[in-house]
Amino acid sequence: MKRQRTRRGLGGSAIAAVMVLTLAACHSTPAATSIHIDLNCVYNGVPGPEPVPDQPGSITVTADSPRWATEGSVIPVVRNSTYTDVDLPISGEVFAFLDVEGGTWNGRIVNNLPALDPATDATVDITESAPGHVAIGVAEVWVVKFVVNRPVSFMCTPTSTPPALADVQVRKNPS
């Protein structure tokens, strides 16, 4: 398992994160007990491999104490010079508020894409840029709702084996 690392951010523009609900195949933590925020594949809005040290615009994760996310918790994602992977325990439904800025994130989202199609949900600015891929508009705040006890994966590794489809809702924060 990767070492948990959380710390208070010192500011800077937030950028998109790729979020993965931890799966037993990759981590010893049971899938229903943590959200894995995978920062290996996005820097400066561009997918890239791990590790990419000292890349301007690469990101780390901060979380307030207590170090678990419950319903309504805010998980800030800020610019930093190093990559960090963080496993956060979860309870119930988790809403992660991501301030997305600085480019377009082209990442692979394994979920029910039709439910997130702008043609059927005007509150979501998501367009399919390639089969199984989406482009998410930036400079907006998004709410990502994870429903626990269902395998959910946000990933951008082309060779990843996707888990079963699950309920994921992405909505623009109205405030």
Regions found by a protein language model. Give the residues of each.
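Secretory targeting and sorting signals
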Residues: 1-29
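Primarily mature extracellular domains of secreted and cell-surface proteins
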Residues: 30-175
